[in-house]
Amino acid sequence: MGSRTPLYEAHVKAGAKMVDFHGWDMPLNYGSQIEEHHAVRRDCGVFDVSHMTIVDVEGSQAQAFLRYLLANDVAKLKTEGKAQYTSMLNENGGVIDDLIVYFFSENAYRMVVNSATRDRDLAWIEKVAADFDVTTKERDDMGMLALQGPKAADKIQGVLTAEQYAEIDGMKPFVGKDVGDYFIATTGYTGEKGYEIVVPAEQLEALWNDLLKADVAPCGLGARDTLRLEAGMNLYGQDMDENITPLEANMGWSVAFEPADRDFIGRKALEQKKAEGHDKLVGLVMEEKGVLRHGQKVTVEGGEGIITSGTFSPTLGFSVAMARVPSSVGDTAEVEMRKKQMPVKVVKPGFVRNGQSVL
């Protein structure tokens, strides 16, 4: 038996097919992964993401600590609640984890990290924190739901009080706010508008049930994966890991090399990698029959690469993928499938946003 979120029984009751996900018993789907995918693109779906790890960082050196620990620069965050996508790197510039950090004040931040890397992340955070005047606290007293889709604002309005909804009405993307016992952020992993809602664990099931009563579709890990891949969002362990730098994972935009005098873990290795040149993560589109899959070989101008994530796209009706390839890549490539070379188009990662193709 794996670890269970506070919603385990609710998932079983809702007919979920449960699977092991990095030691957690999590719902893969509730009957139809494709229907759940379409619900998020066209209406609204809710995911239990309580397996994610929330870490609060406080202390007089909180900002200095995070400026050293993380590749992006938290000093850029000036507005209370503002979120930033970033990563923790090792000395070789490899990605220990990608995460979101929220700014409350220069002495208080919140990080949300992946469940698959939880133990390693927490050990790394504590090790680095030992040299700073900070405290780090895992918030395992909280659960988290992701409410995603074009109708997310309507649905959340129906389960909050008028006063609570007024607090978040019109909130810009990538911002979080304390609303009573909840922490509500305009973030997500689907390419749709929506919210991630951090809730005291004992209140989680009531909120889940209220959302299901409001005709929000419960969604599992299967739809979460096809949605994030359509949106061109990385999955840790597939699209990058501790042996891959952000520069090779289409995450260069989340590394702050300026100001030049800020030292952060992995900086020197990244600067060297930048100077030497490196592979890049691209999107692939195949409108022929067949499905692009993780691990397939990609042939491009000047070399070979590999598909890191691939799937049939329910929104587009054909197969899409992300692949790490030599930087010499042109507009087309070939993927080896069943001993045949299939032609594919090379595009920027990201295929669907707000329900529409961006190809």
Curated annotation (Swiss-Prot):
One GO-annotated biological process of the protein: glycine decarboxylation via glycine cleavage system
UniProt keyword annotation of Transferase present: yes
Any Pfam family the entry gives: GCV_T_C
Keyword flag Amino-acid biosynthesis: no
Keyword line: Aminotransferase, Transferase
UniProt enzyme class: transferase
Function: The glycine cleavage system catalyzes the degradation of glycine.
Similarity comment: Belongs to the GcvT family.
Record's protein name: Aminomethyltransferase
Taxonomic lineage of the native organism: Bacteria, Pseudomonadati, Pseudomonadota, Gammaproteobacteria, Alteromonadales
Gene coding for it: gcvT
